[in-house]
Amino acid sequence: MLDVQSIIIYLGLAIILFFLAKYAELRKSSGAVWLIVILLSLISGLRADSVGIDTETYNTIFDLISKGVTKGIYGIEESFIYICRVLLGIWDNNQFLFLIFALISNGLIIFTIWDNRDNISFRWSVLSYYITFFTFSLNGMRQFLAVSIIVYATLFLKKGKYVKFIIFVLIASLFHRSAIIGVCYLLFEIIFVKYFESKRKLIIYLLVGIVVFFGIVATYGLVNYYSKYFEQQLSSMGIMMIVKAIMLIWSFGVIETPKNNQERYFCFSNRWYYFAGILLNSLNYIFVYMGRIGLYFYIFESIYIGNIFKAKNKTIWTLMFKFCYVCLLLYYLYNNITRGGQGELPYRFFWQI
């Protein structure tokens, strides 16, 4: 049975966000961008225990941290526990933590999209993010925080500020140790090295050598830590990632390649990040939860789709290609508000329980 409140909230928010993003795009209004972040964060941060697969678990964890009983907390980074303890010292309220974490994750991602507004359709990127990824802020909260920090760090990566990028990757790992995979973004720089000046090329070669060396050690540790997830196998395969991979390849034929070097770098880098995300996310069809590791790259689908809708409608194929993505987003939205999948239905605010 359909839940009316959930439909009003999720569908209504999709419409509001699209037109707010359109207003921000046309008026270059950072205030409208902040309003988008606040609306997303309120829905995520004010949710009840019943919304999201692990919200109740996090409530229990926050209660234990508040009481100083941290020995009974397993599988959570000590650094995350310390961060929660500091925040609870400001206001001993679990909902305060949910709201702060929602503001951080949604804020970093939305403002990363906003920073790329010259190369994308901001409204379509925001809508894509909301429909496809917003529910992750209701589940796997620590990892989604880490993902948002990595996504924001790519702004430094594209400017060649590699030290800042690495610092942000380390900060992200304080929330979720899997964030260390973010250093793999440096490996992609080898592919785009032709777009860089000589000094940046040299830095990249040195950094990649270091990343490969330490990455082997780190990967061994991570594989051991997450080996239990490889043991939980699925017997069925899906086709959505295959469809998305085909559409990504199709985009090279129907979307005009920019002539400006900087724009080409933006276009190709985002496509490669997204492609890596598709490949890694496909693990979810074989191993339960392992697809989440691909979220660090897969989330670039939002910027990729924004870039698609920014392209000029020079041929009927371009229009058809965009129409396919409209249908895809509508399909996801329909599933979100009628079936869920991340425990987001029925939506209730914390004061309603």
Where in the sequence are the language-model features?
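Start-transfer (signal-anchor) and selected internal transmembrane alpha helices
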Residues: 1-40
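Membrane-embedded alpha-helical segments of multi-pass membrane proteins
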Residues: 5-16, 35, 100-104, 141-149, ...
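Transmembrane-helix signature of polytopic, membrane-embedded enzymes
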Residues: 27-28, 110-131
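Alpha-helical transmembrane segments and terminal signal-anchor/GPI-anchor hydrophobic tails
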Residues: 49-51, 55-60, 64-65, 81, ...
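Short hydrophobic/aromatic helix or loop-helix immediately within or flanking a transmembrane segment
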Residues: 56-64, 70-92
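Membrane-embedded helix bundles of polyisoprenyl
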Residues: 122-140, 144-149
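Membrane-interface transmembrane helices that cradle and orient dolichyl/undecaprenyl
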Residues: 150-163
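Transmembrane-embedded, aromatic-rich helix segments that form part
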Residues: 165-167, 178-189
